[in-house]
Amino acid sequence: EYNEERGKKVIKYVKNFLDETVPIANASWKEISDIKVKGEDLVFLIGKKENSLKDKQQFIGFNGEKNKLTSILVKKNKLHIDILIDKDNMIGKSDKASIANVVIESALSTIIDNEDSVAAVDSEDKVRCYRNWLGLMKGDLIANMNKNGKKFIRRLNPDRKYISRNGNKISLHGRALLLNRNVGHLMTNPAILLKDGSEIPEGIMDAFVSTLCALHDFKNKNNSRTGSVYIVKPKMHGPEAVSYIHLRAHETRHDLV
């Protein structure tokens, strides 16, 4: 249940944040009653008076109509801030400018772990890990959920679409940058047996399969913007371990090519 008193404090905090991050010239976000787009600029209404951003170049794009916005995209330190506007929203109703939410782009990355945070000890476990990573690289991973009697499907967030200040289309990544954490060098796994019957070094298997799965992303670039795969190799205790994995990674790259 929405707590209106707490909501007022949150709104005040957010307006202070916007005043510091994307300040309005000679005014405060607390004062505005409406926001519109005129030409290539944002216009903030305080009564009948019009104001603009102190730095107009912070305005990147928007959604909705210029006189009836549903979101505003601004930028600070190369990270985007999406200001959502909805006068019918429970929070938007309590704000003079109908601001319902503020979504901040994160510079964080996300590690998909094959080691300490999962108990992948046999072939079936490893296949499950690889299948999840493949789904992330192809962008089609889903999870069927049942929570409190309600069934729903979780999917990867789509890219976020906007109209730029000059009328062009903008697309921003809607997902965090993913890295794959392989297992350490000392582990072996019976999922693949070598010619002599011994188990494959699990870190080598992880490196090969996780890179193979990432080939799907090289084409569509849903994860990497540069057509790369990001692999974390843990527990390297000295130059010998680093040299070992560097050599094996170089050989794997040539095999894949």
Residue locations for each model-derived region?
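Catalytic or ion-translocation cores adjacent to nucleophile or general acid/base/metal-coordination motifs
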Residues: N223, R253, V257
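Conserved small/polar residues in nucleotide/adenosyl-binding loops
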Residues: I245-T252
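Active-site-facing alpha/beta catalytic cores
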Residues: E1-Y244
